[in-house]
């Protein structure tokens, strides 16, 4: 299967529950010592429709040990999302480890290297549902000590540090809102 399914689909076991819907158990990836949230997340997917590639994002905080600020990035495109804020990241390529994809995407988008912390998960799973039927894995991270500061590239209009208490006032992409709320909750425990 191609079109974003590839290796991703080959690793899934389908369990048909109706003639038109499968419940697919997406395997947890090996994240080289990173804490995962759950072993599987169940996602309804129409039969014959390839699963889209997963997406990864970083909730970049000023400090993993004592977070007070988050790097919020406003989208440059597409036009309907322009100016709305998101957590930076991107697609996992075929056969790519999600943690490696996250490091690659942040280097491409923001020119920074990260120290990756704990995964931020939805209740009962490890992948967040987002736009276009995709799913997203999110990790807390901080800028690595040997890295330059993140800066907005072609994908973003701006990248700015925002106090955790002020994040709700930003115009977030709708799919990122529950994720940002979970990030704030995990940072303020």
Question: How should these model regions be labeled?
Answer:
Residues 15-25:
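Short linear motifs in low-complexity or flexible loops
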Residues 66-108, 112:
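Conserved Nudix-box catalytic region and its N-terminal flanking loop in Nudix hydrolases
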């Amino acid at each position: 299967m191609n079109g974003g399914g590839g290796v991703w689909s080959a690793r899934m076991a389908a369990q048909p529950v109706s003639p038109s819907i499968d419940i697919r158990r997406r395997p947890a990836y090996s994240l080289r010592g990173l804490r995962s949230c759950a072993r599987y997340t169940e996602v309804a997917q129409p039969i014959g429709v390839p699963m889209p590639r997963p997406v990864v994002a970083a909730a970049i905080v000023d400090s993993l040990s004592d977070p007070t600020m988050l790097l919020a990035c406003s989208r440059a495109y597409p036009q309907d999302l322009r100016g709305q804020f998101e957590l930076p990241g991107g697609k996992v390529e075929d056969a790519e480890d999600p943690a490696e994809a996250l490091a690659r995407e942040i280097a491409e988008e923001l020119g920074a290297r990260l120290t990756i912390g704990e995964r931020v998960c939805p209740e009962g799973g490890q992948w967040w549902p987002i736009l276009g039927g995709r799913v997203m894995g999110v990790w807390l991270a901080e800028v690595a000590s040997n890295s330059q500061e993140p800066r907005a590239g072609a994908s973003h209009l701006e990248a700015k540090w925002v106090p955790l208490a002020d994040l709700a006032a930003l115009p977030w992409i709708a799919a990122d809102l529950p994720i940002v709320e979970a990030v704030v909750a995990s940072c303020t425990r």
